[in-house]
Amino acid sequence: MAVSFVTTSPEEEDKPKLGLGNIQTPLIFNPSMLNLQANIPNQFIWPDDEKPSINVLELDVPLIDLQNLLSDPSSTLDASRLISEACKKHGFFLVVNHGISEELISDAHEYTSRFFDMPLSEKQRVLRKSGESVGYASSFTGRFSTKLPWKETLSFRFCDDMSRSKSVQDYFCDALGHGFQPFGKVYQEYCEAMSSLSLKIMELLGLSLGVKRDYFREFFEENDSIMRLNYYPPCIKPDLTLGTGPHCDPTSLTILHQDHVNGLQVFVENQWRSIRPNPKAFVVNIGDTFMALSNDRYKSCLHRAVVNSESERKSLAFFLCPKKDRVVTPPRELLDSITSRRYPDFTWSMFLEFTQKHYRADMNTLQAFSDWLTKPI
């Protein structure tokens, strides 16, 4: 397969952030071929101030044991305190004894490997379309022309809604054929488990913020979420590129399961720290939408993924999102005469469209979106 390279004019590279533009001649991301070259294409090389630091210190994140948690008042109080401290500082914590079977997690990783092992032509049958958040993406080569991530992804929607009870299974069968029903069955079950887990976590977040225990659980009960399979191939020049660039998740809550390979890094106190893979734990982090719901009390923290020259890395990311027409506004308990509103009301559909059509997610996405909402017409 031939590899075509993108050339961008200085004018195109200087385009403002809120105009992503369309790339006419996208680069084909084929890592096995790119790794045969002496260097990686310029589109994958990040600026010096954003290049990765591979050997970084480990981040101390609290480990929350969910076993019998919500039925034990003392344990619940301790957990909510630890979560509050972490979410005010960097927004990351781990959960164990979460009730998700090891077999299901293993199957989800296995089918991730099977999908990304398929020929490119097969994966492109579900190619992500411009302006959409679902489908297969090959390093976002058709969306951006610079600072490309060294990864492939497959994203699909999960609707925790009785009227669309098999949305994931239907996606795989409709998009790829009935031969992919086993894929759909595994990821349908996995997403249902993630949705259930996220609602438990929402109870703890509510308690930690001093609002009614069921407030956030009820807010997200009929969620319209996103599941993403991430594949980071080995790279001959891992010191020049990133698997995922620095960003804050625009969604509400991310539940991540890593394989055994290091790669996740979080920016805390002006330095990058790593979160070591733990096969028995899920990494949980606050996203921009929940930061708005908490009226800025909890932080959506900058994070990224690095790659290496020896091992491929895979991860499973479930992004909890509210129903698309649900108005995101803080509960009254988080507002008073002293604490003013930090962000205007919005719906998830508005924010999602902003990130897909107008803005490349980074550490300022929520503020840029707020400015965009309130700018004079």
Swiss-Prot record:
Spell out the disulfide connections.
none
Q: Which domain of life is it from?
A: Eukaryota
Gene behind this protein: GA20OX1
Which residues does Fe cation bind? H247, D249, H303
Knockout consequence? Semi-dwarf.
What this protein is called in its record is: Gibberellin 20 oxidase 1
Q: Which cofactor does it need?
A: Fe(2+); L-ascorbate
Q: Which of UniProt's keywords are assigned here?
A: Iron, Metal-binding, Oxidoreductase
The pathway noted for it is:
Plant hormone biosynthesis; gibberellin biosynthesis
